[in-house]
């Protein structure tokens, strides 16, 4: 049996360095892909796509059917421990949320914003509203289960927009999902469910009008 030599040590050290380099390279590629996807989704969600050709190219890069059925879910977190005052702490919480959504919902496309995570999910328009509502609650429970390992004081909340046909209409669902998340506490107070974790815009009823007008005077009248 040959003895362990200095050359063996050098070979092992070189192998470790090579592995570290490969892991670093893969991480850098993944981060670039996330950034690239984030920029594309930002343009689609904010209605900045200016042509059919651009839409087709974006759909191809995202590996999405431009004519498919989708809905937008906007995730946020609420710290039930101490108030979030430090911006770095808030960003850390959003990073934890992003990781939780990616782990539990590997099939959705994710756009990261400053204070929220936006998920684009394929949707079946033939399912009933009750079925969709149940699915959304299950999604929140899954993400919340993942978040408890990060910080037990962080509560996941989500607003859900309508199902739209075609990527070009995603801004409609995105606006609804954002409005639903913004009004989740108010809606919970009205419904008597203070512990609301998910709100579908379609469940707002007449309160949809509050989100669909930019006229301050009309809002005062309501």
Task: Kindly label every feature range from the protein language model.
Residues 9-10, 15-222:
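Cytosolic nucleotide-utilizing catalytic cores of signal-transduction proteins
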């Amino acid at each position: 049996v040959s003895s362990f030599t200095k050359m063996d040590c050098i070979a092992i050290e070189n192998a470790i360095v090579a592995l570290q380099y490969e892991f670093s390279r893969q991480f850098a590629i993944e981060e670039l892909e996330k950034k690239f996807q984030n920029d594309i989704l930002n343009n689609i969600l904010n209605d900045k796509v200016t042509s059919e050709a651009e839409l087709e190219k974006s759909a191809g890069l995202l590996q999405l059917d431009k004519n498919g059925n989708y809905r937008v879910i906007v995730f946020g977190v609420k710290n039930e421990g101490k108030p979030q005052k430090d911006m770095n702490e808030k960003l850390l919480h959003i990073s934890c949320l992003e990781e939780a959504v990616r782990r539990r919902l590997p099939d959705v496309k994710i756009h990261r914003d400053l204070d929220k995570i936006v998920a684009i999910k394929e949707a079946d328009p033939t399912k009933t509203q009750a079925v969709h509502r149940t699915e959304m609650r299950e999604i929140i429970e899954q993400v919340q289960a993942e978040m408890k390992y990060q910080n037990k004081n962080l509560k996941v909340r989500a607003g859900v927009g309508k199902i739209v046909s075609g990527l070009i209409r995603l801004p409609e669902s995105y606006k609804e999902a954002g409005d639903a998340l913004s009004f989740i506490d108010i809606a919970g107070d009205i419904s008597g469910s203070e512990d609301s974790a998910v709100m579908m815009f379609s469940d707002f009823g007449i309160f949809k009008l509050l989100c669909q007008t930019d006229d301050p005077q009309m809002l005062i009248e309501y």
